[in-house]
């Protein structure tokens, strides 16, 4: 199934008229949140950037700053995220995951494991332009051990391109993983890192099938048994992303909402970052793999203007 987002360019777009609607929604007493959320969720990111430019031209004011002073809570966070230029959004999330005391490994793992080599190259460039530092250096400074090594391998963005599959190499890699884990006292983490971090996607899908045949285990079961902590989470995220990026992100969204409390940071990040890439596919995978739809789960787990905006971005129910 071809990848598609839920948010596209609005036809008949008029940035100046939109800027006027937003100014009116925030001027005077009270704020018209409905006008803001209905308008911004129906525009692509590129169009939102144009609206912000028109807003500054017409009123001499910064649209995002105005919204920050008028809106609050999760709804404010969501709207501010929608206004970040797409190419900077992942870089921004990574920067914040690395900033200050403590590292948000969950964010590092999710973004670096699920982005394609092309996307990772663009993220590295945006990060350097925006923050004046090298993403890989910052990651190395904030992580350690095999977890750090796997992140560095992925950040090289040198995964083999998808070409004709070499069955002999598939067999060799599957055997090497079996020997590095299940057949060994201890684990040869480097073998897992090299194979999972550098082989092509189509090759690895075949390796996972072959691994099941020779070992009797899914590769995920072996990773679960043989590794732990951040490295385990990263290797599992890579394997799941190799199998299907939309399925991995659907699972990420599911666990952000399942049980008590909601991980709103993850919910906002995945919905916003994928809304123009593959959120439609993520929705389909969500419906297929869980006993509910993404739309229903958001509806039951969030409230107010925040809920309204997320549902509009989600783009519909999947029965």
Swiss-Prot record:
[IL]-x-C-x-x-[DE] motif, short sequence motif: residues: 312-318
GO molecular function: calcium ion binding; calcium-dependent phospholipid binding; identical protein binding; P-type calcium transporter activity; peptide hormone binding; phosphatidylserine binding; receptor tyrosine kinase binding
UniProt key word Secreted: no
Modified residues (Phosphoserine): 35
Annexin repeats: from-to residues: 13-84, 85-156, 168-240, 244-315
A Pfam family reported for this protein in Swiss-Prot or TrEMBL: Annexin
Residues carrying N6-acetyllysine: 68, 74, 77, 95, 99
Keyword Metal-binding part of the UniProt annotation: no
Cross-link (Glycyl lysine isopeptide (Lys-Gly) (interchain with G-Cter in SUMO2)), chain numbering: 27
Residue numbers of N-acetylalanine PTMs: 2
Cross-link annotation Glycyl lysine isopeptide (Lys-Gly) (interchain with G-Cter in SUMO1), location: 27
Keywords: Acetylation, Annexin, Blood coagulation, Calcium, Calcium/phospholipid-binding, Hemostasis, Isopeptide bond, Phosphoprotein, Repeat, S-nitrosylation, Ubl conjugation
Modified how: S-nitrosylation is induced by interferon-gamma and oxidatively-modified low-densitity lipoprotein (LDL(ox)) possibly implicating the iNOS-S100A8/9 transnitrosylase complex.
Functional summary from the UniProt entry: This protein is an anticoagulant protein that acts as an indirect inhibitor of the thromboplastin-specific complex, which is involved in the blood coagulation cascade.
Family per record: Belongs to the annexin family.
Domain notes per entry: A pair of annexin repeats may form one binding site for calcium and phospholipid. The [IL]-x-C-x-x-[DE] motif is a proposed target motif for cysteine S-nitrosylation mediated by the iNOS-S100A8/A9 transnitrosylase complex.
Protein name as it appears in the record: Annexin A5
Species, as recorded: Rattus norvegicus
Lineage, uppermost ranks: Eukaryota, Metazoa, Chordata, Craniata, Vertebrata
């Amino acid at each position: 199934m071809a990848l598609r987002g839920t948010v596209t360019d609005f036809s008949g777009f008029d940035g100046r008229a939109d800027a006027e609607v937003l100014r009116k929604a925030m001027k005077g007493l009270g704020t018209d949140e409905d006008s803001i959320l209905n308008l911004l969720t129906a525009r692509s990111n590129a169009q939102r950037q144009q609206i912000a430019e028109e807003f500054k031209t017409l009123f001499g004011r910064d649209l995002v700053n105005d919204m920050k002073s008028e809106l609050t809570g999760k709804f404010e966070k969501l709207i501010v995220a929608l206004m970040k230029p797409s190419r900077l959004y992942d870089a921004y999330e990574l920067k914040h995951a690395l900033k200050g005391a403590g590292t948000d490994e969950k964010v590092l793992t999710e973004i670096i494991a699920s982005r394609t080599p092309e996307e990772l190259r663009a993220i590295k460039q945006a990060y350097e332009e925006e923050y004046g530092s090298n993403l890989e250096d910052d990651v190395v400074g904030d992580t350690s051990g095999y977890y750090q090594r796997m992140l560095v391998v992925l950040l090289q963005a040198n995964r083999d391109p998808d070409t004709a599959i070499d069955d002999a190499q598939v067999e060799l890699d599957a055997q090497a993983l079996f020997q590095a884990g299940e057949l060994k006292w201890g684990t040869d983490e480097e073998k897992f890192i090299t194979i999972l971090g550098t082989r092509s996607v189509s090759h690895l899908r075949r390796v996972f099938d072959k691994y099941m045949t020779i070992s009797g285990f899914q590769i995920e079961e072996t990773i679960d048994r043989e590794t732990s902590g951040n490295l385990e989470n990263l290797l599992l995220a890579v394997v799941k992303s190799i199998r299907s990026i939309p399925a991995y992100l659907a699972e990420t969204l599911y666990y952000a909402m399942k049980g008590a409390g909601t991980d709103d940071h993850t919910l906002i990040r995945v919905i916003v970052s994928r809304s123009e890439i593959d959120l439609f596919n993520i929705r389909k995978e969500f419906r297929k793999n869980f006993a509910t739809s993404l739309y229903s789960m958001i509806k039951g787990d969030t409230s107010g203007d925040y809920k309204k905006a997320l549902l509009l971005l989600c783009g519909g129910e999947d029965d």
